[in-house]
């Protein structure tokens, strides 16, 4: 038989000291853990169902100022290379805006928020007539759609993605709003 002194056993199998335990930093704690889009119930003749995006730890996205940026080590490139998704912890020296990565609850596809929010009013309500209310909610019209004057793409006045997502409930509270959804870019899939 072979015997080990108890001291050696305790050194090998003991837990690390509290000071040595490192908790992974949550770089995106200001972002919601879940983003719920849509609603349950009837919208006209078709049934709309709610979709949930869940924040995925261990991944982050870098939003570059120009498309086509070479992103070494990226696991996914979106929007012609303007957004790159990486695994691991973000490097604070990254040249670009950092954001979290979400997964679509139903199929675990990676999704990245862009900071744009799509708003749709009742068809009788023109977005231009609601510009002041939109501004009071902390948003500005980024793009009006001439073929659908009751819809528009919005962005937070601050320009921050986190502010755009955080204010969705304020937009939903505006009278005659039918739908508010953040733009979430995902890898193109074949059907």
Predicted regions and their residues:
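Primarily auto-inhibitory N-terminal propeptides
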Residues: 2-191
């Amino acid at each position: 038989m072979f015997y080990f002194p108890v001291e050696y056993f305790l050194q090998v199998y003991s837990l690390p000291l509290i000071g040595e335990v490192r908790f992974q930093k949550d770089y995106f704690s200001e972002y919601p853990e879940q983003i719920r889009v849509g609603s349950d119930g009837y919208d006209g003749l078709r049934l709309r169902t709610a979709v949930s995006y869940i924040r995925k730890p261990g991944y982050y996205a870098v939003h570059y100022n120009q498309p086509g940026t070479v992103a070494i080590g990226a696991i996914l490139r979106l929007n012609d290379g303007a957004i790159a998704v990486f695994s691991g912890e973000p490097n604070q020296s990254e040249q670009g805006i950092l954001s979290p990565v979400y997964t679509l609850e139903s199929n675990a596809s990676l999704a990245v928020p862009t900071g744009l929010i799509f708003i749709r009013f009742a068809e009788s309500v023109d977005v231009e007539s609601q510009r002041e209310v939109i501004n009071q909610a902390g948003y500005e019209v980024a793009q009006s759609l001439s073929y659908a004057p009751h819809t528009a793409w919005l962005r937070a006045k601050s320009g921050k993605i986190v502010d755009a997502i955080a204010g969705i409930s304020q937009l939903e509270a505006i009278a005659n709003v039918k739908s508010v959804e953040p733009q979430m870019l995902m890898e193109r899939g074949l059907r």
